[in-house]
Design a protein with these regions (language model features):
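Conserved alpha-helical positions within TPR/SEL1-like repeat arrays
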Residues: 22-32, 56-67, 90-101, 124-135, ...
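PAPS-dependent sulfotransferase catalytic core
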Residues: 259, 269, 282-395
Length: 486
């Protein structure tokens, strides 16, 4: 008897005995199996009307709303199931999964931990907890859950994938590759395992391995857009830009997919290299539009960084600086030089030249200055006016603590250069705390700097979000150098 025949039989049974909630529950299951989601919800609700403590019916309704992408109703019904039965593992796990899918990591963690208390060795829960830890950058915690999985089932491929992901984010690419290879071996039909390993080979510039593995991928998944994307990237790496364009213009991904950002970015750079600026600019614009609408971009606010610049522009004026209390500074333990400038202005080239000198050491792009100034009293620039020697010594110590994470300052013959271009906006604070500090300002033609920032694939933060639009990049340049020049 097929599902539709079973539905008709159950309808007859319900008509004869309309108060048996089990029959409604079973009918709801059949409607779900035949993809009649709205009818299934309606019948499960009738089941609940007959037995209001039927937590399984609430769980099934929640899953149906999840399928219908009605997340709020799904969450509400999972919570109703849990309220009736606080130890109902399925609903607790499912609710954790919903929160994970919508990137509510705090709530997903709470529900997965509760699920684990009920079924301690539930592998999907352990794996999802690891994903939560990865997304909240608690990598060691993530490894703990993944190693627990491997003790239970050493052939669970997603655990190795996620271990690889952790090492990817930690920039330990060789360990990343080892674990991605294990995932491929254990799950040879899963395109995602191959995709991850291709990405790791590309990131680590292991182009021979990248090329050889790509040949295998093309045999297994000849028409897969991800494989074609990597074929285009490899052609780009081999400077075959026209072939890259041919590869990448015949595929596309969902606009919310990071692969679509990557595809447009490589097309932009390829057109740039073959001197077709209009096409290049078009694809750079598309890349940035996609980035601006990505999930990651929602975590950042370009206006916050602009406001930080404007706040300093408004404060560091002669009228305010004239009010500063005179201080008898003690000699700093550090002989400090700051390498600053607008991004893409040549600071990396200067870094390469300077670090070739045996008596120069570069601390590259570390948050030494921002950590220090975050400790200024009440984070208020006006407190620089009457700052005390004790407060200055405290701030210097905070800087030195960060400094010593990367270099030992005991050798007085060494010149240490703190290189972070956008420290240019903190020069006022730096000079109030280290009046003997020196600055190397890297300058490039403004048009080149701004355009280069617009074309660059920066990791997004509040500052870098200003480079997704060329007019925002221009305004940022103008405001920063107005601050510098005043």
């Amino acid at each position: 008897m097929n599902y539709f025949d079973q539905i008709e039989e159950l309808k007859k049974i319900i008509k004869a005995n309309p108060n048996n909630f089990v029959n409604y529950f079973n009918l709801g299951n059949l409607y779900r199996k035949t993809n009649q989601l709205d009818l299934a919800i309606k019948i499960y609700q009738k089941c609940i009307n007959k037995n209001k403590n039927n937590f399984q019916a609430y769980n099934n309704i929640a899953n149906l709303y999840k399928e219908k992408k009605d997340i709020n109703r799904s969450i509400d019904n999972f919570k109703l199931a849990i309220k009736i039965n606080p130890n109902y593992h399925n609903a607790i796990y499912n609710l954790g999964s919903i929160y994970l899918n919508i990137k509510d990591y705090r709530n997903s963690y709470i529900y997965f931990i509760n699920a684990l208390k009920i079924v301690p060795n539930h592998i999907p829960t352990l794996n999802n907890l690891a994903v939560v830890m990865i997304n909240t950058k608690k990598y060691n915690e993530g490894l703990k859950y993944l190693n627990q999985i491997i003790k239970i089932d050493k052939k669970f491929a997603p655990a190795y994938t996620n271990i690889g992901n952790i090492y990817w984010y930690k920039d330990e690419v060789e360990k990343c590759i080892i674990n991605y290879k294990k995932s491929v071996d254990l799950n040879p039909l899963n395109i995602n395992s191959y995709r991850n390993l291709l990405g790791a080979y590309e990131k680590s510039n292991q182009l021979n391995d990248y090329s050889e593995f790509l040949k295998l991928c093309k045999k297994k998944f000849p028409d897969n857009p991800i494989i074609i994307l990597h074929e285009g990237i490899l052609n780009f790496r081999n400077k075959n830009y026209k072939k890259t364009i041919e590869n990448l213009e015949k595929i596309s991904f969902d606009p919310k997919d990071l692969f679509e950002i990557k595809r447009n970015s490589f097309l932009a750079k390829s057109y740039d290299f073959i001197n077709l600026p209009d096409s290049a600019f078009n694809y750079f614009t598309k890349t940035n539009d996609l980035s601006e609408n990505s999930y990651d971009a929602k975590n950042y606010d370009k206006k916050k960084y602009i406001n930080e610049v404007l706040k300093r522009k408004n404060y560091f004026i002669k009228e305010n600086i004239d009010k500063w209390k005179k201080i008898n500074y003690s000699k700093s333990n550090l002989n400090l030089v700051f390498l600053i400038g607008f991004p893409r202005s040549g600071t990396t080239l200067l870094d390469t030249i300077l670090r070739s000198h045996p008596k120069i050491k570069i601390i590259e792009e570390k948050p030494l200055v921002t950590t220090m100034i975050s400790k200024i009293k009440n984070k208020n620039l006006k407190n620089l006016e009457n700052i005390t020697n004790d407060e200055i010594n405290f701030l210097r110590q905070e800087y030195q603590k960060e400094f010593e994470k990367y270099e030992n300052p005991e050798n007085k013959d060494i010149v240490y250069i703190d290189k972070l271009p956008l420290n240019i906006i903190y020069c006022g604070e730096i000079l109030r705390i280290f009046p003997d500090a020196k600055f190397i300002l890297s300058l490039r033609h403004p048009l080149d700097s701004v355009l280069s920032c617009f074309m660059q694939d920066f990791v997004l933060n509040n500052a870098m979000a200003n480079f997704l639009r060329i007019d925002d990049a221009t305004k940022l340049y103008e405001n920063i150098f107005n601050l510098w020049n005043q």
